[in-house]
Structure formats: structure tokens, C-alpha cells
UniProtKB/Swiss-Prot annotation:
Specifically interacts with the ligand binding domain of the thyroid receptor (TR). This interaction does not require the presence of thyroid hormone for its interaction. Interacts with proteasome subunit PSMA8; to participate in meiosis progression during spermatogenesis. ATP binds at residues 179-186. Plays a key role in chromosome recombination and chromosome structure development during meiosis. Required at early steps in meiotic recombination that leads to non-crossovers pathways. Also needed for efficient completion of homologous synapsis by influencing crossover distribution along the chromosomes affecting both crossovers and non-crossovers pathways. Also required for development of higher-order chromosome structures and is needed for synaptonemal-complex formation. In males, required for efficient synapsis of the sex chromosomes and for sex body formation. GO terms for molecular function: ATP binding; ATP hydrolysis activity; identical protein binding. This is Pachytene checkpoint protein 2 homolog. The gene is TRIP13. Keywords: Acetylation, ATP-binding, Differentiation, Meiosis, Nucleotide-binding, Oogenesis, Spermatogenesis. InterPro entries: AAA+_ATPase, ATPase_AAA_core, ATPase_AAA_CS, ClpA/B, P-loop_NTPase, Pch2-like. The modification N-acetylmethionine is found at residue 1. GO terms for biological process: double-strand break repair; female meiosis I; male meiosis I; meiotic recombination checkpoint signaling; mitotic spindle assembly checkpoint signaling; oocyte maturation; oogenesis; reciprocal meiotic recombination. SMART domains: AAA (SM00382). One of its GO terms (cellular component) is chromosome. Belongs to the AAA ATPase family. PCH2 subfamily. The keyword ATP-binding applies.
């Protein structure tokens, strides 16, 4: 127990101690090397680099042992609470090493038996999953959403380990992310589950992510829905009983619960619907007592979330469309990827927003392209993160159609793709 508490204390910020730097070590799937041997070699690598600038990643190694067994070594999450990368003196920091291997298996389906057919009630991943690798870094937000969520879950686990009386200080292990569609709520939940599984790899051998299909729960074919929901949560309970696993239960579009309850009250839905809602809430209350479970929920319609459910959520975080600054970061990551793949060629250095601010947004040969990207970002405000990530592909498909393109040509195409997106939205709204 003391060792587990120590792991959590290391993961949480502490004013009185040296700052903690988290280093994620991606062990190759084919590697059978011991984690302790890998950690020893990684510490030798870090000892040769006293100062790093923000997040940093090594993909190539001089050490033959690391080259054989490690895919990458990454200093991560140093920029969650600061606007810009800062120089980090590794010698003055506590280094937390997290060694992990990705599960290549993909999701499986959890089915519930009904009289006439089997209903897919949930999808199930073993974490960390290859499918979610890199997802955390791809999500860009203006406020400290990611750091707040990490700190919340780490505090939840610490309070549990310290046996804090939950009657005196209440916490439910329930997170609610709400906001318009396409803002990355579900992706953030999955990325958070992956990140925490890696962050707590010294304590839990693996993670389990169960994504419940809310719509299936209220299927018209469910003659005994309440009993079937209980069956599904019994499967989840079986996972929770394995104390080597950190279990995440994801309920997407949780407003479905509210819709069913309200419709039942209005007399438009059978009483079976209200039994399903009550069964889900009861089961949530039961599983949240366990220290190795976190319940993640999302909603697209904030006003329709049931008060009974909202009261259960410790964190109610609004996730809105990205600002121009966040859009700039999203586009910048897309351009970096296309330059790495040599679809945009030759490679050219783009300035960050902070660097543009430092030169007063003055246009010159160095800043010209970055200023154009900033302008495109501003006119992209109002588009969801989901759409923004598609636009580079659409820009190429609609306006380039060539194996390679210069960055100037690509930015022109991206600008046209943004204009087209707003034109299509205007046409759709006029038809409604």
C-alpha cells in the first residue's frame, strides 16, 4: 500500500518537492526485456541531456539495448499548464518513468442476450491500445482541461489509498464532459483512459475501457431492459474485481438517460424505459465504490442532462469549439505530419504563435507563411475539431491532387477548403 501511495504522490504536483517530469517509454511489442533494465538504460540516456526544451522525443538510440527494445522515449505533458515550451533542468527534477507496451488486439464487443437477438451493448479495449496511441497529443484545448482531468483522477486514487472517509469528503469517480458535437469529448475520454493506464503502469498491470452503447440500452427490443443492464454491469464488475486492472467505464451521449426518463414521465415511453435509467444509475452507484474504477461520460446537449446524474459528477467540464489559437496548433500539427510524409515538400520551418507575438506579427520572409496560417486559423473559428482535422485531407483532394505540393500551395488550398466548408454549412442551414 505504501508503495502504491508513493507512486501516486510522484504523479501528483507537490509545492514542497522538486517538480516531477513524466517520461513515457514505449517498449517494442516484440521486446521481452525487463522493465527495470529498460528504466536503467533510459536514465543513462536522460543523464546525458541536462536541459530539454518542453516536451521532447527520442526515436533513435546509440545504445544497442534501447535500439532493440524501445520504440521511443518521450518527455511528456510539460506544456499542459504553460502556454509555451520552457527549458527544463532534468537534474533538478524528479523523473517518473512509465514503461508500456501497446495492445494490438483492437476492440471486442460485449453482447447481451435478448429473446430474439443478441444486442451489442458495449465495446471493450485492453489498454494501452495501439488504436489510441498519439490520441492525447492530437487533442488541443485553450484551457487546462487535460491537466485538470489528470489531476482529478490522480487525487481520486490517492484519497482512496489514504482511506479518506467519503462521508466527510465526497467524491464519486464520475467525470462529465459536455458541449457541442465534434469537439473531441469522446476522444478525450479514451485518450485520458490511455494516458492514466500508462501513468499508473507501475501500479496496475493494464487498463480496461468499456464504452457503453447508450442507444442499445433503450432499444425497443428490450422487454426486460433493467435486468439486461444489470447483466452488463455484472460483466463490468467482473473486470473491476481484478485489482491488477484500472477500469474505465465510458457512457457516451449520457443525455439518452434523461430523454428516456422525461419521455416516460410525459407518458410517451413505456415504464420499461424508466427502469433502464434507474438501473444504470443504481449500477453506477455500486461500481463507483471501488478504488480501481473511473466513470467517464459525455453529453452533446447540456440542458437535457438529468439532475440526478449531474449530481453524481465530480467534474463537469465544458468542451467548446477551439479558438483561433488552438486551431493554429491543430493546423500546425497537420502541416508537420504532411511535411514528415513529404506530401508537402520541401520542408519549411513555421513559427509558433508565441514566436509571432515576439516579433510583433511583422511580415518578413521568415514569418510570411506562419502569418498566412494564422489568418486561415482566424477564419476557421466556429468549426469543430473533428472538421478541422479533416480539412487538410479535403484541401488536398479538392484543390491539389498531386503527389507533392509546396507549403505555399497547400496553404492556399487549405484556405479554399475552409471557405467551402462555411459555404456548405450555409446551404445546409438554409434548407432546414
Amino acid at each position: 500500500m505504501d508503495e502504491a501511495v508513493g507512486d501516486l504522490k510522484q504523479a501528483l504536483p507537490c509545492v514542497a518537492e522538486a517538480p516531477t517530469v513524466h517520461v513515457e517509454v514505449h517498449q517494442r511489442s516484440c521486446s521481452t526485456a525487463k522493465k527495470e533494465d529498460i528504466k536503467l538504460s533510459v536514465r543513462k540516456l536522460l543523464n546525458r541531456h541536462n536541459i530539454v526544451f518542453g516536451d521532447y522525443k527520442w526515436n533513435e538510440f546509440d545504445d544497442p539495448f534501447l535500439a532493440r527494445n524501445v520504440q521511443s522515449v518521450s518527455i511528456v505533458d510539460t506544456e499542459l499548464k504553460v502556454k509555451d515550451p520552457q527549458p527544463i533542468d532534468l537534474g533538478a527534477c524528479t523523473i517518473a518513468l512509465h514503461v508500456f507496451q501497446l495492445n494490438e488486439g483492437g476492440p471486442s464487443s460485449e453482447t447481451l442476450e435478448e429473446e430474439t437477438e443478441n444486442i451489442t451493448a458495449a465495446s471493450h479495449w485492453v489498454l494501452p491500445a495501439a488504436e489510441f496511441h498519439g490520441l492525447w497529443d492530437s487533442l488541443v484545448y485553450d484551457v487546462e482541461v487535460k491537466s485538470h482531468l489528470l489531476d482529478y483522477v490522480m487525487t481520486t486514487l490517492l484519497f482512496s489509498d489514504k482511506n479518506v472517509d467519503s462521508n466527510l469528503i465526497a467524491w464519486n469517480r464520475v467525470v462529465l464532459l459536455h458541449g457541442p458535437p465534434g469537439t473531441g469529448k469522446t476522444s478525450l475520454c479514451k485518450a485520458l483512459a490511455q494516458k492514466l493506464t500508462i501513468r499508473l503502469s507501475s501500479r496496475y498491470q493494464y487498463g480496461q475501457l468499456i464504452e457503453i452503447n447508450s442507444h442499445s440500452l433503450f432499444s425497443k427490443w428490450f422487454s426486460e431492459s433493467g435486468k439486461l443492464v444489470t447483466k452488463m454491469f455484472q460483466k463490468i464488475q467482473d473486470l473491476i474485481d481484478d485489482k491488477d486492472a484500472l477500469v474505465f467505464v465510458l457512457i457516451d451521449e449520457v443525455e439518452s438517460l434523461t430523454a428516456a426518463r422525461n419521455a416516460c414521465r410525459a407518458g410517451t415511453e413505456p415504464s420499461d424505459a424508466i427502469r433502464v435509467v434507474n438501473a444504470v444509475l443504481t449500477q453506477i452507484d455500486q461500481i463507483k465504490r471501488h478504488c480501481n474504477v473511473v466513470i467517464l461520460t459525455t453529453s452533446n446537449i447540456t440542458e437535457r442532462i438529468d439532475v440526478a446524474f449531474v449530481d453524481r459528477a465530480d467534474i463537469r467540464q465544458y468542451i467548446g469549439p477551439p479558438s483561433a489559437a488552438a486551431i493554429f496548433k491543430i493546423y500546425l500539427s497537420c502541416l508537420e505530419e504532411l511535411m514528415k510524409c513529404q506530401i508537402i515538400y520541401p520542408r519549411q520551418q513555421l513559427l509558433t504563435l508565441r514566436e509571432l507575438e515576439m516579433i510583433g506579427f511583422i511580415e518578413n520572409n521568415v514569418s510570411k507563411l506562419s502569418l498566412l496560417l494564422s489568418e486561415i486559423s482566424r477564419k476557421s473559428e466556429g468549426l469543430s475539431g473533428r472538421v478541422l482535422r479533416k480539412l487538410p485531407f479535403l484541401a488536398h483532394a479538392l484543390y491539389i491532387q498531386a503527389p507533392t505540393v509546396t507549403i505555399e500551395g497547400f496553404l492556399q488550398a487549405l484556405s479554399l477548403a475552409v471557405d467551402k466548408q462555411f459555404e456548405e454549412r450555409k446551404k445546409l442551414s438554409s434548407c432546414i
